[in-house]
Amino acid sequence: MANTKSAKKFIIKSKKNRNRNLSNRSMLKTFIKKVNIAINKRNISEALFAFKNMQKCIDRQSIKGLIHKNKAARCKSKIFRRISLLIN
């Protein structure tokens, strides 16, 4: 258990950050699932719209440091490859 006042404050801060990170990670997964569902339905317009929203979310989270920028690039590339196969 924390002994000093600053250590107690740090515990509170880390709990807040953890909850925020869990929420943001969950939101990110939801956006990715929406794109995958649209791709599986073979709905191009819905997939492109969902991809656009997912891309914004991924970029935002990578800037904030929730995920690494290379992982963000990999994820966007992987999903866009699937969409382009659907278009062609």
Swiss-Prot record:
Answer yes or no on keyword Transmembrane.
no
User: Could you give a GO molecular-function term held by this entry?
Assistant: small ribosomal subunit rRNA binding
Do you know which SUPFAM superfamilies this protein is assigned to?
Ribosomal protein S20
Query: A Pfam family this protein belongs to?
Result: Ribosomal_S20p
The role this protein plays is: Binds directly to 16S ribosomal RNA.
Q: What NCBIfam families is this protein classified in?
A: S20
Q: What is the protein name given in its UniProt record?
A: Small ribosomal subunit protein bS20
Task: Look up and give the organism this protein is from.
Answer: Blochmanniella floridana
Species lineage: Bacteria, Pseudomonadati, Pseudomonadota, Gammaproteobacteria, Enterobacterales
